[in-house]
Amino acid sequence: MSSVNANGGYTKPQKYVPGPGDPELPPQLSEFKDKTSDEILKEMNRMPFFMTKLDETDGAGGENVELEALKALAYEGEPHEIAENFKKQGNELYKAKRFKDARELYSKGLAVECEDKSINESLYANRAACELELKNYRRCIEDCSKALTINPKNVKCYYRTSKAFFQLNKLEEAKSAATFANQRIDPENKSILNMLSVIDRKEQELKAKEEKQQREAQERENKKIMLESAMTLRNITNIKTHSPVELLNEGKIRLEDPMDFESQLIYPALIMYPTQDEFDFVGEVSELTTVQELVDLVLEGPQERFKKEGKENFTPKKVLVFMETKAGGLIKAGKKLTFHDILKKESPDVPLFDNALKIYIVPKVESEGWISKWDKQKALERRSV
């Protein structure tokens, strides 16, 4: 220990060196001799000076006398002195980034209800700073408002109000608070100027984003109008069914040039093999494609399924192609015709189904039997009303 000598001078602290028969620890620490490190830390945490978390017991469930004494001291003095003390303690905790604890002390200071307006202003303003750090933006705004009621020229509160509104995506309110502080209170305040700059950048970003969305929406609308015009020009109708094939989601009817209704129409195509209960899907088929070209595409090539027994008639020369009419019947599609030629005819009226071409490929030898079983009423029932 350090001490003052007989002449009033300072004596340098001496290191404790145990002599023969002396305890290994100095007398001040002898009570910790037989305790583990965890037990020592727990014991020290009950001492206010070393306390890192609140422990209101004496270790055995009793009262922590030292802590209770400190609590009593906190409320000694005049109301403004007590409130000021809470404010100072809160400020220390705020500096240590212990925002929740600091907020609690500021709240205790306000609960004193002292009559010193400047202290109450600081307590509200400082608690607002804690709420801002804790992302409780609406509470921050409320406390700033209370502080500004006391002192309408508190620039920090305008800044915190602006920042809180900004975080809530309320740019108009954020800009209003910062602009008022800049124009009416402190034109040179760097925090306010920076906040105005941040708001301006955000406004520009949102404006650019909105303009882009409007352009894209207008472009989609223009493309939609062009596509509808192209289909009307070609006398094409579309019929929706109750249960569209999911694969149709992978294709979409479109114009080769989206902004030219006279350019080629491109269709997705559903190719049905009704006698086999199978189907194919082709994502894009030009309206200038002939029926024969589409048949060649799906039947020629190394398709093992058409080489199996019972499927030997699925070759381009041994099949017929049928398409469903608007009335629910069938037509035989000439293989030399383009789909443009077929779809534009007023009679028979062959529509698209779910915005896709739909053709039936049937072996010639099985075609009569399949046609005889075609049920017009069931075909109509498959469609949406």
Swiss-Prot record:
Where the TPR repeats fall, as residue ranges, is 83-116, 121-154, 155-189
Q: How does it assemble?
A: Monomer. Component of Hsp70 and Hsp90 chaperone complexes. Interacts (via TPR repeats) with HSC82 and HSP82 (via C-terminal MEEVD pentapeptide). Interacts with CPR7, SSA1 and SPI1.
- Classification via PANTHER family: TETRATRICOPEPTIDE REPEAT PROTEIN 4 (PTHR46035:SF1)
Specify the taxonomic lineage: Eukaryota, Fungi, Dikarya, Ascomycota, Saccharomycotina
From the UniProt entry, list the residue stretches annotated as the region Disordered.
1-37
GO cellular component terms, alphabetically, are:
cytoplasm; nucleus
By what name is this protein known?
Answer: Hsp70/Hsp90 co-chaperone CNS1
The places in or outside the cell where this protein is found are: Cytoplasm
GO MF terms on file? Answer: Hsp70 protein binding; Hsp90 protein binding; ribosome binding
Give the domain of life: Eukaryota
Please tell me the species this chain comes from: Saccharomyces cerevisiae (strain ATCC 204508 / S288c) (Baker's yeast)
The UniProt keyword set, sorted, is:
Chaperone, Cytoplasm, Repeat, TPR repeat
